[in-house]
């Protein structure tokens, strides 16, 4: 039974990721006055299936000088972590209900750095290694602000369980009271998932393709799936943390529909940002975090600690 639950969890995520690639190409196409994919199937709807067949039937190439085991393990690890992060998310019910769900998600998003680092090092290519080092520095840096923002939210929420967050936001979404945190969280998720305008790991002009330059066929598709699964999970997290994923506790179908709609809207905003903004310079990226976001998040964290203490109020307890 657990295997069936697991499959019912994983297959829709992979399908959503596949069609997210189509949505991205269509959105970018229309924003650049092009059509996007429109040959395979009606309106290009079967393009992700054609891409999957092409990628998984090609011969997986491996550089002669690469470290074989690590080269193969890295993409598998990336996809495994990207899919595992979904398990504690209430949509509105979780696959595994964890007491420390938020810490679990934060820890796994930190682990995803290893797959990028291993792939860059095992490829034995200077471009891949530079891309991997950039990715590691960027991801670890932005995790600092993500952790502090989560701590601030937890001080309002009263526990680390994600289900408690839904109860906290029954009357009012947290984005109303914590909008500066929400803005910084959203920008940090862009950097955490290596998306434009923070896609310095795959700067085509200087790094050819970044950490995955030596990958082709199936392993490349795994990295691709992991990246888009991470984008969706980060937007799902944003919905749960700030937008209140539930509408009515008597109709759980409505809750799921509300959650999906908000997550989709945030994902489309990711694509809109990619079409609108040029890439940051690396020093600007680091200055934004260490000189802007970190001081503000620390100050806001102190503010959210002082409010319950000053007003002698406690967060909602289950």
Curated annotation (Swiss-Prot):
Subcellular location: Mitochondrion inner membrane
Reactions the enzyme catalyzes: a ubiquinone + NADH + 5 H(+)(in) = a ubiquinol + NAD(+) + 4 H(+)(out)
Sample GO molecular function, one term: NADH dehydrogenase (ubiquinone) activity
PROSITE patterns in the cross-refs: COMPLEX1_ND1_1, COMPLEX1_ND1_2
Keywords: Electron transport, Membrane, Mitochondrion, Mitochondrion inner membrane, NAD, Respiratory chain, Translocase, Transmembrane, Transmembrane helix, Transport, Ubiquinone
EC number(s) per entry: 7.1.1.2
Topology versus the membrane: Multi-pass membrane protein
Enzyme category, top tier: translocase
Predominant cellular place of this UniProt entry's protein: mitochondrion
Transmembrane segments: 2-22, 68-88, 100-120, 136-156, 172-192, 223-243, 253-273, 294-314
UniProt record, GO biological process: aerobic respiration
Gene Ontology CC terms, in alphabetical order: mitochondrial inner membrane
Alphabetical list of InterPro entries matching this protein: NADH_UbQ_OxRdtase_su1/FPO, NADH_UbQ_OxRdtase_su1_CS
Entry similarity comment: Belongs to the complex I subunit 1 family.
General function of this protein: Core subunit of the mitochondrial membrane respiratory chain NADH dehydrogenase (Complex I) that is believed to belong to the minimal assembly required for catalysis. Complex I functions in the transfer of electrons from NADH to the respiratory chain. The immediate electron acceptor for the enzyme is believed to be ubiquinone.
Protein name as it appears in the record: NADH-ubiquinone oxidoreductase chain 1
Gene name per UniProt: MT-ND1
């Amino acid at each position: 039974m657990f295997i069936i639950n697991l499959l019912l969890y994983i297959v829709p995520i992979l399908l959503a990721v596949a069609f997210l690639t189509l949505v991205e190409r269509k959105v970018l196409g229309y924003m650049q006055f092009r059509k996007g994919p429109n040959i395979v199937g009606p309106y290009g709807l079967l393009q992700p299936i054609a891409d999957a067949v092409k990628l998984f039937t090609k011969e997986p190439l491996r550089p002669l000088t690469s470290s074989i085991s690590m080269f193969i393990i890295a993409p598998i690890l990336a996809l495994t972590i990207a899919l595992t992060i979904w398990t504690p998310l209430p949509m509105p019910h979780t696959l595994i209900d964890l007491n420390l769900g938020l810490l679990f998600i934060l820890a796994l998003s930190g682990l995803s750095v290893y797959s990028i680092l291993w792939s860059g090092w095992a490829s034995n290519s200077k471009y891949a290694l530079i891309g991997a080092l950039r990715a590691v520095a960027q991801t670890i840096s932005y995790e600092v602000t993500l952790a502090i923002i989560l701590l601030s939210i937890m001080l309002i929420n009263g526990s680390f369980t994600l289900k408690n967050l839904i109860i906290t936001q029954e009357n009012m979404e947290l984005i109303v009271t914590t909008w500066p945190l929400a803005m910084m969280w959203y920008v940090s998720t862009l950097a955490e998932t290596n998306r434009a305008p923070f896609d310095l790991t795959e700067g085509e002009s200087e790094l050819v393709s970044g950490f995955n330059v030596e990958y082709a066929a199936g392993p490349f598709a795994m990295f691709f799936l992991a990246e888009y699964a991470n984008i969706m999970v980060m937007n799902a997290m944003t919905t749960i943390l700030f937008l209140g994923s539930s509408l009515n506790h008597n109709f759980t179908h409505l809750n799921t529909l509300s959650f999906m709609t908000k997550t989709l809207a945030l994902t489309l905003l990711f694509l809109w940002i990619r079409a609108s903004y040029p890439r940051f310079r690396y020093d600007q990226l680091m200055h934004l975090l260490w000189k802007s976001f970190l001081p503000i998040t620390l100050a806001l964290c102190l503010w959210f600690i002082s409010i319950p203490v000053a007003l002698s109020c406690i967060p909602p307890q289950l």
